[in-house]
């Protein structure tokens, strides 16, 4: 999970960044958590090495899944892209009611669903309607994908959209209380209640669609700027639930197995919360990719859809002919 201000300063970007998220570089208190989660999730998905590198990132690159944390991508302050801003406590005078908090998290879910829909839509350009062959011009064979938000070759657009969906899905578990252990010491804004769920949230499963019932008690953290200690207060310096109090943003992950080490934030270090969030994020990423595969086959039919999926996964489109 990335400390975005530090990252922005490291890259020479002179603006304030939003809350942290699963890490995208190896340094500045992060350990390429987004990359490791994505690789652990898709290790058996049949992606070619270069394709997985482009999607998950590798040393020196953000990849599609890390692009929302890239300072020049323009999404650092987009709360919906990181599941931020859904804070609420059931106490008198809290400045954000439960319905407003739920709307912030509904926007996060909608971001994921739109990205998956965009991936399926872009995939259709890989094998044009009526054709029985891959359009080689839609495959990045010599020049890699950029992931800067501009539309280009179809496979790049597919990977970029999948990266957006995976990123926000992973941040959901890092930034909310869904997977946090419910413990007796919890209760206030500095240690809000965990929901104690194991595994991914059915509410975030794209199969559930936009109409699923909002999970009771689900919140994420307030983020208004850095340092966080100067923000997210109300009344006579009363605290809102801050991102700093709730995030499980940092720790080491084995990319081959998905096993997580100790959390390196206060919330992540308590009760095994980092490992719980990582396990849920891996499962969520797997479910999102399976949804993309199923939708591609449903929309384009078995024959065309299978050829499209082969081109998305393979490094060399000749392997699909």
Segments predicted by a language model, with ranges:
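Catalytic glutamate of the conserved HExxH
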Residues: 164, 168, 172
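Positively charged n-region of N-terminal signal peptides that target proteins for export
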Residues: 1-4
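N-terminal signal peptide c-region/cleavage motif recognized by signal peptidases
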Residues: 16-18
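N-terminal, motif-rich segments that launch catalysis or mediate targeting to/interaction with membranes
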Residues: 20-163, 175-321
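Bacterial N-terminal signal peptides
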Residues: 6-14
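Alpha-helical and His/Cys-centered functional microenvironments
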Residues: 7, 38, 171
């Amino acid at each position: 999970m990335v400390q975005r201000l530090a990252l922005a300063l490291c890259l020479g970007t002179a603006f304030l960044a939003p809350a942290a998220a699963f890490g995208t570089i190896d340094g500045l208190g992060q350990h390429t958590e987004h990359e490791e989660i994505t690789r652990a999730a898709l290790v058996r998905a049949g992606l070619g090495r270069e394709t997985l590198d482009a999607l998950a990132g590798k040393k020196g690159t953000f990849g599609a899944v890390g692009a929302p944390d890239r300072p020049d991508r323009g999404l650092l302050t987009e709360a919906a892209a990181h599941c931020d801003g859904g804070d609420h406590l059931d106490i008198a005078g809290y400045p954000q009611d439960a319905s407003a908090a739920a709307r912030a998290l509904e926007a996060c879910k909608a971001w994921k669903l739109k990205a998956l829909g965009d991936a399926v839509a872009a995939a259709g350009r890989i094998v044009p309607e009526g054709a029985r062959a891959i359009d080689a011009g839609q495959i990045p064979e010599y020049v890699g994908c950029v992931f800067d938000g501009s539309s280009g070759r179809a496979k790049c657009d597919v990977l970029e959209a999948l990266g957006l969906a995976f990123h926000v899905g992973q941040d959901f578990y890092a930034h909310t209380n869904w997977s946090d252990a419910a413990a007796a010491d919890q209760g206030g804004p500095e240690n809000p209640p965990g929901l104690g769920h194991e595994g991914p949230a059915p509410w975030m499963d794209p199969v559930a669609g936009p109409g699923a019932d909002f999970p009771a008690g689900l919140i994420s953290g307030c983020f208004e700027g850095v340092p966080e200690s100067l923000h997210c207060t109300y009344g006579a310096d009363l605290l809102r639930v801050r991102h700093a109090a709730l995030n499980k943003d940092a720790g080491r992950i084995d990319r081959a197995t998905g096993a997580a080490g100790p959390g390196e934030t206060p919330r992540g270090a308590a009760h095994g919360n980092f490992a719980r969030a990582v396990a849920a994020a891996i499962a969520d990423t797997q479910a999102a990719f399976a949804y993309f595969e199923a939708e591609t086959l449903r929309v384009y039919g078995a024959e065309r859809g299978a050829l499209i999926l082969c081109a998305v996964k393979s490094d060399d489109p000749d392997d699909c002919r």
